């Protein structure tokens, strides 16, 4: 599944903001608009036993250009919340459910 970082209208959002994948399915986050974005999983909102730092980008690491991607594969079932650290305050947050 491919998730856009930034709406086609320039919105600071993940598109779609909430989605479901199968365990082991690759998720590709793709910069859509050229604003600097990243993907950080919230350590308090991932399934028990999952190390959020191992599936997140570094807070300082950014996808700056349109078309740049970050891929992650989640194997533990459950719900994961994530955000873009530069734009979290603007509501750029998302959620993925792994089945």
UniProtKB/Swiss-Prot annotation:
UniProt binding sites for Cu cation: 37, 84, 87, 92
Topology within the bilayer: Peripheral membrane protein
Disulfide bond in keyword set: no
GO molecular function, one term: electron transporter, transferring electrons from cytochrome b6/f complex of photosystem II activity
Domain of life: Eukaryota
Cofactor list: Cu(2+)
Keyword Plastid assigned: yes
Classification via PROSITE patterns: COPPER_BLUE (PS00196)
Record-annotated Plastocyanin-like domain positions: 1-99
Keywords: Chloroplast, Copper, Electron transport, Membrane, Metal-binding, Plastid, Thylakoid, Transport
Signal peptide: none
Compartments (UniProt record): Plastid, Chloroplast thylakoid membrane
Task of the protein: Participates in electron transfer between P700 and the cytochrome b6-f complex in photosystem I.
Family under the similarity heading: Belongs to the plastocyanin family.
Protein's name in the database: Plastocyanin
Organism, as annotated: Rumex obtusifolius
Gene: PETE
